[in-house]
Amino acid sequence: MKIGIIGATGYGGAELVRILNHHPYAEDCILYSSSDEGKEYAASYPHLRNIASQSLQPLHIETIRNEIDVMFIAAPPGVSGEWSPKLAEAGIPVIDLSGDLRIQNPAVYEKWYKRKAAPKGTIQSAVYGLAELQKEEIQTAKLIANPGCFPTAVLLGLAPLAKNGLLQDSFLIVDAKTGVSGAGRKASMGTHYSELNDNFKIYKVNEHQHTPEIEQQLAAWQPGTGPITFSAHLAPMTRGIMATMYTEAPPGMSAAQVRELYSEFYKDSYFVRIRPEGEFPATKEVYGSNFCDISVTVDERTNRATIVSVIDNLMKGAAGQAVQNLNIMNGWQEETGLTMTPVYP
């Protein structure tokens, strides 16, 4: 299969290149850029020399339609809204890693992303690609909205409750931490070493654009689920997300019963690992992999459940899940090209 990537010079795009180099069905990778065409790709990422030696190609739909079988879009917001309709018209399936197509209501998107939404028809034709939960829809999809990094960790952590109608949304707090690579490669004051090192800070309080994405999916699984309290924090690490969720425990269920619910729910999901009683995951334990590790417990004193979910934001939170969706779309084993062991320590 010939695969194209728009936005290969970003961290998510570079991770796609790394993964696809090990994918048995990736015959060729063509990397596109509207600003750096002709530039040697390895000049941007020297660690990929002798692995991805190609030059960046110009973005022209006339040539693209004859070059590739599927396109990943790993570009900033706005690019997919422009290119997805063109690629769809050319009959090329698209997996979009941006947030352009995740929010079904254009007005909600514009409120949270502070930019014009993609065409409504394009948004409505996109399948939300949370791989473990949307397999049937993904199998026949031609346009996939790859979930955001925070929503992936949070939704996988809450799905067993919400899909069984057990989520108690009267009290639901999501406290999430991320590594700095989630902010992208472009330099900024907030990601400057002197600002980040030996520091830990909250950001986008009550304004994080992943909030409506989480709420939208929870309401789809358990109608009537209300707003959540979501806080994002920037940790002094390169990769990783830890989402800790606090909610009222399902009525009449012990910690062991809730844990069994989770284990049964994900028993056929290779990439979701439910930790045993008393064992809680750390971001380092999924580093560089497509795994999501989850622990769940119930405090019988407060009758509240605590769910901890960890992922690598560039893998399960972006490129890894995108390739997992590619595998599902094509009827391949989900793990194809994704069986890399977490890098530890």
Curated annotation (Swiss-Prot):
Catalysis: reaction(s): N-acetyl-L-glutamate 5-semialdehyde + phosphate + NADP(+) = N-acetyl-L-glutamyl 5-phosphate + NADPH + H(+)
Annotated GO MF terms: N-acetyl-gamma-glutamyl-phosphate reductase activity; NAD binding; NADP+ binding
InterPro entries hit by this protein: AGPR_AS, AGPR_type-1, NAD(P)-bd_dom_sf, NAGSA_dehydrogenase, Semialdehyde_DH_NAD-bd
Pfam families per record: Semialdhyde_dh, Semialdhyde_dhC_1
EC id: 1.2.1.38
Protein's job: Catalyzes the NADPH-dependent reduction of N-acetyl-5-glutamyl phosphate to yield N-acetyl-L-glutamate 5-semialdehyde.
This protein's name: N-acetyl-gamma-glutamyl-phosphate reductase
Species annotation: Bacillus velezensis (strain DSM 23117 / BGSC 10A6 / LMG 26770 / FZB42)
Gene field: argC
